[in-house]
Amino acid sequence: SLPPDEKATSLPSMSLELLSVERKALRINLDSKMYGTFAEIGAGQEVARHFFQAGGAAGTVAKTMSAYDMKFSDKIYGEAGRYVSRKRLVQMMAHEFGLLQDRLSSDRGEVSQFFAFSNTVSALNFHKTNECHGWMGIRFQLEPLGEMHDIILHVRMLDRENRLQQEAIGMLGVNLVYGAFHLNENPDDFIQ
């Protein structure tokens, strides 16, 4: 467990504590209120991986998935025209958040802040000829039974190795989940 001085709270800008990606994932995992899904397409399941490696993920992760094949993706989320697009990301977040509410609201809705993290990424191909970018977002509640909030990012990846792109996506995703819950009242700190 975390020491008392590391309780999950919004921190004032002047005393913003710098935490490692692993520590941020662990903080989320140890908060019994936060519960959600990770749906990642195109650069592995790097964000979910951080939460599993941090420990305690059973209390946070309802489901992870990667609908890598385009036909599977269309069957799950509906057609979007382009697979790496804001439209596809919003479809993913809406579908996954809807499943959380449909399947778990009666059991956990009054005590859980649900979230659906999603990304769709065009990572570096084998020939290193493609534009590397993606969309990443989270749909989340700030309190149990609360309204939904969305944060959506467009990401350009400049690393010229696939492994480095995957690592960057993983770190950015953890920071997005952490920021959504712990820095939502401090936009400047969230962006840093």
PLM features: what roles do these ranges have?
Residues 1-3, 10:
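Short, positively charged and aromatic/hydrophobic N-terminal segments
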